[in-house]
Amino acid sequence: MKRTQYNNLVSSYARALFLVSENKLSVVRKEVEFLLAFFKSQHDVFIYLSHPMISFARKKEVIFSVNEHLSESLVKFIAVIFANKRSNLLISVLEKFLTLVRESENELEITIKSAETLSESNIKIITESLSFLGKIVRVDNAVDPSILGGFIVKYGFNLIDASLKSYLDRLVDLSKVEILKTRNFI
């Protein structure tokens, strides 16, 4: 399956779930978050459900065993995905659904990568400076010592790189250009 076909299918299913859930969006959102966490912690279950040789009836049984945490509409939606033999799309569909929910509620999820864990006050300063983007709901502070200092903020497809490593890399590149200029190579 081509990437665009895959993305179109994922988007179509996610929009369908979004439209079906519109009156109870917060409930379905929590269920989807639970389900994604469950599949990430129990990845073998997802692999089992994605296997083409497992019957639709058996897949339905497994999903209904998780039913105490899921609404009937979400279980039926998942059953449709399985019936259409699209179980391999399930995690992507659920993640895309959460993206649609965040967009509809003007929320933003950001990741701040820093050399050390940031204090709450530092996180607050960064999030306040990004307030023009929309309401920031979740901040994930990932630690990556390789950036040496500063931080890198990711939101959506955007990146703000204020890391020391990036700054030093740019200085190295500029110094190479200057050396080449002095030697009349440029």
Swiss-Prot record:
It is a peripheral membrane protein. The lineage of its organism: Bacteria, Pseudomonadati, Pseudomonadota, Alphaproteobacteria, Rickettsiales. GO terms for cellular component: plasma membrane; proton-transporting ATP synthase complex. It comes from Wolbachia sp. subsp. Brugia malayi (strain TRS). This is ATP synthase subunit delta. InterPro entries: ATP_synth_OSCP/delta_N_sf, ATPase_OSCP/d_CS, ATPase_OSCP/dsu. F-type ATPases have 2 components, F(1) - the catalytic core - and F(0) - the membrane proton channel. F(1) has five subunits: alpha(3), beta(3), gamma(1), delta(1), epsilon(1). F(0) has three main subunits: a(1), b(2) and c(10-14). The alpha and beta chains form an alternating ring which encloses part of the gamma chain. F(1) is attached to F(0) by a central stalk formed by the gamma and epsilon chains, while a peripheral stalk is formed by the delta and b chains. Keywords: ATP synthesis, Cell membrane, CF(1), Hydrogen ion transport, Ion transport, Membrane, Transport. It is found in: Cell membrane. SUPFAM superfamilies: N-terminal domain of the delta subunit of the F1F0-ATP synthase, V-type ATPase subunit E-like. Belongs to the ATPase delta chain family. It comes from the Bacteria. The gene is atpH. F(1)F(0) ATP synthase produces ATP from ADP in the presence of a proton or sodium gradient. F-type ATPases consist of two structural domains, F(1) containing the extramembraneous catalytic core and F(0) containing the membrane proton channel, linked together by a central stalk and a peripheral stalk. During catalysis, ATP synthesis in the catalytic domain of F(1) is coupled via a rotary mechanism of the central stalk subunits to proton translocation.
